[in-house]
Each structure stands twice: as C-alpha cells, then as structure tokens.
From Swiss-Prot:
It is found in: Virion. Forms the portal vertex of the capsid. This portal plays critical roles in head assembly, genome packaging, neck/tail attachment, and genome ejection. The portal protein multimerizes as a single ring-shaped homododecamer arranged around a central channel. Binds to the terminase subunits to form the packaging machine. GO terms for biological process: symbiont genome ejection through host cell envelope, contractile tail mechanism. One of its GO terms (cellular component) is viral capsid. It holds the Pfam family Phage_portal. Its main location: virion. InterPro entries: PBSX_Proteobac, Phage/GTA_portal, Phage_portal_PBSX. Keywords: Capsid protein, Viral capsid assembly, Viral contractile tail ejection system, Viral genome ejection through host cell envelope, Viral genome packaging, Viral penetration into host cytoplasm, Viral release from host cell, Virion, Virus entry into host cell. This is Probable portal protein. Belongs to the phage portal family. PBSX subfamily. Homododecamer.
Amino acid sequence: MKTNVKTDNKKGIVIAPINDRTFSLSEITASPALDYVGIGFDENYNCYLPPVNRHALAKLPHQNAQHGGILHSRANMVSATYEGGKALSKMEMRALCLNLIQFGDVGLLKVRNGFGQVVRLVPLSSLYLRVHKDGGYSYLMKKSLYDTAQEIYRYDAKDIIFIKLYDPMQQVYGSPDYVGGIQSALLNSDATVFRRRYFSNGAHMGFILYSTDPDLTEEMEEEIARKISESKGVGNFRSMFVNIAGGHPDGLKVIPIGDTGTKDEFANIKNISAQDVLTAHRFPAGLSGIIPTNTGGLGDPLKYREVYHYDEVMPLQEIIAETINQDPEIKNLLKIKFREQNFAK
C-alpha cells in the first residue's frame, strides 16, 4: 500500500510517501463457544438441546491440562469405593461418573431379559443423549465425534434412568458444576498455544523493517518482501543477507514490535487461570499434581483427601445410589452400594 504525498499547508511540512507492507501468520481458530445458552428445541430430532454445547464440553479436557486431569481424578474418587454388582461393572461405574461430572447428567439404559425384567444397566454417552418433550430419549449415536453418519435409537422414559446435577435455570438436563471455570480453562489453553507459536516462529512477535536508503531499488525491495513473506512457518525465519551497494549504515533497520520472552504475562496467566479451574471444580491443589513453588508446600494431601471425600465425593455417590435404587424396576440384586471410606491412621 502506498501513501500519497501530503503537505501541511500551515507549517509547510512535506510528508514523504511511505511504502509499507505487513506480514502476519494465519490466525488460530477460536475455541468453540461454551456459553450457557439455555434450553433450545431441535425440530429435526424432536428433542431438547442441552444448555451448554456437548461437543465443546467433550473437547475441553483435551485443551486444558488441569481441567482434563481433575475430571478423571474426580471420576476415580467417586467410583473407587463402588462395591460392584450385577447392575454395573466397576468400569461402567467409572464411565457413569465421568459422564455425570463432565456433562452434568448421564443416562443408564435398562437391559431386559426375555420376560421384560431388568437384568443390568449400561451407561450411555451423555454427548449423544437427548431428551424428548414426552419424557422419552433419543441416542444420536456416532462411531466417533467427527463422523457425519449416525444412527438414532429411541427409548421410552421407563427404559432410561436419568441422573443429573441440578440446574436452577432449567430442569430438562443437568449442568456441569464447573461452568464458571470454562473461560479460565480456555484462557490457559490459549496462553499455551500462543507460547508454542511464539517459539515455533523464531521467538518473536514481529518486527518493522524500516528503510530510508535511497539506493534500495524496487527490485531489491520486492526481493526482501518476498523473502520475509516466505519465512512464515515453523522455524523458517532465521536471518537474511542484504547488500546495498553504496548504501548508508542506518539505511535499513529492524525495529522489534515486542519480545514476549520478557514482557508477556504468560506465567501469571497460566497460574491464575489454573487456580480458577481448581476453584471451579472445588478441587484441592494438594491433590491436583501441582508442584508447590513455596517452601511450605501445599499441606497434607491425606487431610485434603479426607475432607474432599466427605464434602464432594460422598454427596455425588448418594445422588447416584439414590436415583438408581429408587427406580421401581431395580430389584435388590441390582441395587447400587458404595462402601464407607476408612481414613483412620
């Protein structure tokens, strides 16, 4: 782009024409929207839409280390004291817990024998389970998250035990209890991606190549511009040789826009956003695998574990057991039970 010569008539100052070119790398694709949008209705499948995008919730653990680790740790803690039984295997109980914590609800399909009696339960992925207006359910099954082909299974309300975490804004679906920390998890991920690009691109944010040398020909200018443009990509930008015959020592300057190595807030963003994620999950830092930065450490993990068990693990276990055991088709042999945790020294 060329700027025309302009004259300030009041001061008689001539503003010289400027040849300016800008070069930038392609932008990172924005993270999926994870706002709470409330309940919608899908006319195509005749079902309600969850308040938070389920596909985005499914991808979120892969974007943030703290969030993904805490989800699995919470699922392990809740399912650890499950005694097992005919209704659910221990692996299925863990799948139940992970779905419930990650998505805020989980559906259990009743498997019946030839007489119509319930003989076991199977947890369905909350990613694909949808609720109908009449109380029934659709399971929009896919082989993988990115598969366009899908099969739709429809179930009556009596065939599904639906466990959900209470949401005061709607009572159709549950809602994950960490919603307030989603943006912090995304910010933490964005900071990491930015730093990766920073190092991959030669550890610089960018620069201005400033030339005032009259001996710089248009051919040389085009060649320099081409070289800079071709330097985009991982590790490609290193150095450039420019020879201007009879040029001036200060005729060509590189002016850095900024050096994120010393000026950015990467460490602060990572630390604060990680704390937000822990707070959203109400998960003790002493159990999260965080390396303490002070001499005092993070306290006694055994004490944290005991308190966390009584305040967070047991209430979730009670919700699971109560919802399953109160179903009239669940007989004594299929009832769910968690053993008491003994923290005695």
